[in-house]
């Protein structure tokens, strides 16, 4: 009988694997077993470990302490028994606690249209995140992005941007899996995550490029956001009966009441519509006209509710053929996107994540669309005026 293969035993597995009595790979912040099962992964029951020659490891992403402070702490630690100082690193590390606190006390507001939304995003959505890993990662990514957007020291900005990118990327696979398996149990979490990735998708690449001195195109970024949200129409279509009885019933774009467009908005949309009609595009014409009709609804609904859903829903419901036209830089889809950029610019005066995005988008599109045709020039006048260039 061959000898048994030796293996290193460990008592440092996560709480969930211990309860299930399965081998834990001890990955941080979330082990592979909990990732695949979409469980909240915790290491709260790890025993205190005494190890000769090891020093205490405080898990924190804050700036290092001043030399004299760190030396003082080290002296105090050396006076204590090693077993009282050294402990295994927790899965839910201090930065994660900081980010969850940031979201539940501040960041949640950037997803609210009015006071009636507050309790949903501050309390109920974090509760949902405890059951769905993709939503937990989305919340942590958005909170980290919020800190990066308001930080002043470059090292802090880049550190929190890295954390935001990490959690943003980690949320994709389980989110896509949930999109493909919608149920009344997970539809709230999927809907919430759709809103979160829209906000992050608009703001994160732009902020990251600015602080790293990289080239960036707001047009390309918006195409990426469109593609990112292509599966989200399924959320609205399939889960609408479930959402009617949930916290998200009031966020249904089609149920938002419409207001009256002002005279300039009416004229601008009519010019856009006439221009699109004059250009015979058999492949994309129908998608372009639908995008304009939807845009008109967005203007009307935002005039009544001022809720971000009234604007962001346009990214979800536009057709694939319209997005293809944007990707190929066709003038008409670009012009339609420019008019939506005016609405995005309006959001920038209310929400930190949209600040400057609409202006950058319209400015870039004005440089992209060049025409000496008077009809085109007239269509460009209103967006140019609205952002002040």
Predicted segments, located by residue:
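N-terminal cysteine-rich, zinc-dependent DNA-binding domains of eukaryotic transcription factors
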Residues: 1-49
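Intrinsically disordered, low-complexity acidic/Ser/Thr-rich segments used as protein-protein interaction/activation
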Residues: 3, 20-21, 37-39, 46-276, ...
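Short helix-capping and inter-helix turn/linker motifs at the boundaries of alpha-helical repeat units
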Residues: 4-11, 115-116, 312-316
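Residues within alpha-helical segments
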Residues: 18, 35, 140, 144, ...
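Extracellular structured ligand-interaction cores
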Residues: 28, 188-190, 335
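C-terminal effector modules of eukaryotic transcription factors
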Residues: 127, 220-389
């Amino acid at each position: 009988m061959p000898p048994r293969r030796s293996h290193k035993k460990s008592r440092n597995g996560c709480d969930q694997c211990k309860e299930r009595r399965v081998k834990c790979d001890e990955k941080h912040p979330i082990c592979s077993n909990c990732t695949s099962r979409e469980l909240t992964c915790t290491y709260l029951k790890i025993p205190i470990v005494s190890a000769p020659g090891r020093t205490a490891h405080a898990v924190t992403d804050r700036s290092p302490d001043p030399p004299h402070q760190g030396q003082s702490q080290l002296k105090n630690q050396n006076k204590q028994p090693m077993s009282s100082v050294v402990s295994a690193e927790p899965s839910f590390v201090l930065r994660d606690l900081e980010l969850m606190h940031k979201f539940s006390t501040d960041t949640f507001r950037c997803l609210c249209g009015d006071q009636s939304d507050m309790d949903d995003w501050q309390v109920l959505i974090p509760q949902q995140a405890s059951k769905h890993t993709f939503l937990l990662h989305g919340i942590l990514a958005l909170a980290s992005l919020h800190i990066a957007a308001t930080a002043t020291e470059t090292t802090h900005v880049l550190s929190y941007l890295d954390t935001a990118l990490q959690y943003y990327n980690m949320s994709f696979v389980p989110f896509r899996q949930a999109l493909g398996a919608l149920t009344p149990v997970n539809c709230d979490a999927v809907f919430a995550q759709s809103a979160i990735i829209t906000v992050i998708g608009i703001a994160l690449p732009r902020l990251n490029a600015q602080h790293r001195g990289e080239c960036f195109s707001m047009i390309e970024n918006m195409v990426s956001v469109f593609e990112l949200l292509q599966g989200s129409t399924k959320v609205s279509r399939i889960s609408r009966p479930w959402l009617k009885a949930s916290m998200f019933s009031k966020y249904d774009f089609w149920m938002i009441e419409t207001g009256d467009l002002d005279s300039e908005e009416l004229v601008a949309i009519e010019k856009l519509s006439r221009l699109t009609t004059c250009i015979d595009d058999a492949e994309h014409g129908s998608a372009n006209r639908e995008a304009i009709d939807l845009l008109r609804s967005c203007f009307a609904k935002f005039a009544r509710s001022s809720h971000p859903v009234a604007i962001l829903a346009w990214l979800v419901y536009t057709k694939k053929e319209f997005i293809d036209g944007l990707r190929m830089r066709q003038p008409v889809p670009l012009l339609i996107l420019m008019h939506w950029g005016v609405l995005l610019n309006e959001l920038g005066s209310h929400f930190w994540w949209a600040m400057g995005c609409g202006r950058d988008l319209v400015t870039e599109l004005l440089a992209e669309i060049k025409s000496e045709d008077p009809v085109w020039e007239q269509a460009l006048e209103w967006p140019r005026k609205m952002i002040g260039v």
